[in-house]
Amino acid sequence: MFLTAVNPQPLSTPSWQIETKYSTKVLTGNWMEERRKFTRDTDKTPQSIYRKEYIPFPDHRPDQISRWYGKRKVEGLPYKHLITHHQEPPHRYLISTYDDHYNRHGYNPGLPPLRTWNGQKLLWLPEKSDFPLLAPPTNYGLYEQLKQRQLTPKAGLKQSTYTSSYPRPPLCAMSWREHAVPVPPHRLHPLPHF
């Protein structure tokens, strides 16, 4: 005999008592309304694992030396170590590597034409970065031109950068056609043949 009960029928139960036992998962009563009720386990505020296991030390003071080392590590090198090069004054090493490569085409009279391999340091010496160009930067007067444009007062309406920098096209580039292209009437269109 096959039963649909959750637990099999014990042997002590008589065979004539064959009512099926319903499982506890059967929904009875006002299960829809009871399902929407929120029952809190405790009235206390829930505690996280960190809060439960945290041990306070009231007389603890933070380690200032560790903080100082961490702060120095995050800040990195100071400005004088990043910018200064062999104690040169700042007005003499203003040429960047980009400017040297693209505008001056690698011209540096202080460097020999060929580099040699140093087996002890495992480097090609001398490096270009060790001998920076000691001259003012190549700016082609762009800074002075921009400063002059910003300092001269302009009278009249204010214009956007796009309007002021957009050149007016020549008159020959304009189209002199005053009317739209004529469209033939519908009666002159050929009928489609299927």
Curated annotation (Swiss-Prot):
Annotated region described as Mn 1, given as residue ranges = 45-60
Renumbered to this chain, region (Mn 2) spans 95-107
Give the stretches traversing the membrane: none
Any idea which UniProt keywords this protein has? Cell projection, Cilium, Cytoplasm, Cytoskeleton, Flagellum
The role this protein plays is: Microtubule inner protein (MIP) part of the dynein-decorated doublet microtubules (DMTs) in cilia axoneme, which is required for motile cilia beating.
Oligomer status and interactors: Microtubule inner protein component of sperm flagellar doublet microtubules.
Which protein, by its recorded name, is this?
Answer: Cilia- and flagella-associated protein 107
Q: Which gene encodes it?
A: CFAP107
